């Protein structure tokens, strides 16, 4: 499928919502199927969990990764780059950088802009203390997803937290990592066991 953009840099056939200042209201562009109530927000306040997102404030919602991907597609980008800042058994930090396509909000040939100037970066981490037991096996992926979500959200001024960004540990103790496992089959360790 090929997406066609008009002279303003917007996808043809898409109904965009606008703010009073004529910029795009990217928050309004999030389809309801990509949102759901933030269970933690309601539990912390001993309030019943709503069955729909209707009428909820942004701080009472979470956005799915699918919603962030949809926003990035609507906005348009040239490329996405990831840099691993830190990668240890119990802590991974990743920086995501996105080269956005110019549009009327930040045109390519505006004063001070040159091709490639529409770049935004953000960073996120995943640790054994802020992920669930299952996710602790995939810290690199979780950190990359969190960085992507933050990069898109912050560039487009979206104040709904991404589901991928929140602490999913539920207060449980992290899985104990045995640092010596990586050396378990090293020749010296095999000899020491005999």
Which role fits each region the language model picked out?
Residues 1-192:
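Polyanion-binding surfaces on beta-sheet-dominated domains and ring/shell assemblies
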């Amino acid at each position: 499928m090929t997406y066609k953009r008009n002279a303003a840099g917007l996808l043809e056939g898409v109904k965009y919502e606008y703010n009073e200042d004529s910029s795009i209201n990217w928050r309004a562009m999030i389809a309801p199927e990509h949102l759901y109530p933030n269970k933690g927000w309601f539990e912390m306040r001993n309030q019943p969990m709503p069955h729909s997102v209707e009428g909820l404030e942004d701080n009472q919602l979470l956005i799915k990764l699918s919603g962030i991907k949809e926003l990035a597609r609507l906005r348009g980008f040239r490329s996405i780059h990831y840099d691993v800042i830190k990668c240890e058994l119990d802590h991974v930090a990743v920086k995501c950088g996105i080269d956005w396509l110019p549009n009327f909000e930040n045109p390519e040939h505006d004063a001070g802009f040159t091709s490639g100037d529409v770049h935004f970066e953000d960073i996120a981490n995943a640790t054994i203390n802020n992920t669930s037991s299952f996710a602790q096996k995939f810290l690199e992926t979780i950190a990359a997803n969190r960085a992507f979500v933050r990069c898109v959200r912050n560039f487009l001024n979206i104040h709904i937290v991404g589901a991928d960004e929140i602490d999913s540990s539920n207060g449980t103790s992290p899985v104990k990592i045995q640092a010596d496992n990586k050396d378990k089959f090293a020749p010296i360790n095999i000899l020491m066991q005999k």
